[in-house]
Amino acid sequence: MSIKEQTLMTPYLQFDRNQWAALRDSVPMTLSEDEIARLKGINEDLSLEEVAEIYLPLSRLLNFYISSNLRRQAVLEQFLGTNGQRIPYIISIAGSVAVGKSTTARVLQALLSRWPEHRRVELITTDGFLHPNQVLKERGLMKKKGFPESYDMHRLVKFVSDLKSGVPNVTAPVYSHLIYDVIPDGDKTVVQPDILILEGLNVLQSGMDYPHDPHHVFVSDFVDFSIYVDAPEDLLQTWYINRFLKFREGAFTDPDSYFHNYAKLTKEEAIKTAMTLWKEINWLNLKQNILPTRGRASLILTKSANHAVEEVRLRK
């Protein structure tokens, strides 16, 4: 089926890997193999080929969108006769736990910051906006960590709203996966970035998810371009379990780790524990809150085995 025929049936243009890779045009590879190795996640295969065929075309597309947005801002300033404040272009990245959102975010940050314009690209994860464990315990939400109700949504929305309003210095809390909690007094200051990449589970949620409470303002209201990283559920489960097993041999062995006790599990016990955590928390959050937002994304990256993107869908 041609792209033209698809356009009549869906709000997305659909590309297989080869079609998408052809859209790279002449964008140069600006990352070395060593840099790519540092960018990838704990359980992901990220190659020069993946960056060249998937992420370079995506960075080219985003550069077009961002340049268009800058021209629009310039037109508005000319009309108003003002010198406007620098307003960041916000890119959100959503998707399930273990799908590779963080790797996608880091690769895009590296590529976009290397465009000739030398843009300042900041990366913020919404993990920092989780309520502290003390609050979650008081509210009985420790087993709902990552669900929408576990976040300080007021602070998260204010953060992106302030950035879009031109506030020069905005602070974001920082999360530690070692202590499984927000770092007290560990805020990061974000100073007028050209581009902000916001990575998190629920960044595509909108008022449609709360039909009985329509007065909410959401992060998605401030996002210029949204990406959903997708994969079949069986792969997500496998990746989650494999990641858990690697943490068991790595991060969990640190005595300061919140999950230090998991390091003592046998492999069979660890697999069983990971399966339970997946089914009772992460799969539930995926089905109830994350997956229903996929159709709102500007672009959907669908992965197959080894975290390789096999299909790209771009909203018209």
From Swiss-Prot:
EC number: 2.7.1.33
Positions bound to ATP: 95-102
Family matches, as InterPro entries: P-loop_NTPase (IPR027417), PanK (IPR004566), PRK/URK (IPR006083)
A Gene Ontology BP annotation from the UniProt entry: coenzyme A biosynthetic process
GO molecular function: ATP binding; pantothenate kinase activity
Entry's localization field: Cytoplasm
Catalytically driven reaction(s): (R)-pantothenate + ATP = (R)-4'-phosphopantothenate + ADP + H(+)
Protein name as it appears in the record: Pantothenate kinase
